[in-house]
Amino acid sequence: MTSTLPNDNIRNFDDQITNKLISEIIRDRIKNAGKRFSANDNISDFINPGELEILEKEVASRVRDLLKSLVIDVENDHNTQETAERVSKMYLNEVFKGRYYEQPKVTSFPNDKNLDEIYTVGPITVRSACSHHLVPILGECWIGIKPGNKVIGLSKFARVADWVFSSPHIQEEAVMILADEIEKLC
């Protein structure tokens, strides 16, 4: 069986044996674990070292096919010759990084001062992508919290918000996921 992709280098050793795309291998791992892989799910636990780079090449190939289907000259137009690679990197490492990378490490500390008043952090600039149309969502959020037994540094709220919003979402779900993640930390 031959590869459906123009560049056989995007396959890793296991893939050469099974003749599956890396996206299929990762998807199978997730399914075999009985987990979901919805648009806003983090799937980093199912991606082995080196596979994100292979996935990036697979996605670039698919983006190139999309551009060709849109009748865009990706071979001769200097403006679009490397667009597929740039788009692939952008989606995997920026726009959707909340799917493919672990949550950033955030250290919480005991609330030794017994802080009991609401404090607010914001505005925090957030960007995401609508999971229905994959169009950008840009905005600001404020986080208000009454400390419990633990507290985290103010800058950590922005770090967690960036990670949560860096997945395809509908906005209402993103806000609920952010609240759940903050609750776990505090």
Functional labels for PLM-detected ranges:
Residues 2-186:
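A domain-level signal for the structural core that forms small-molecule/cofactor-binding pockets
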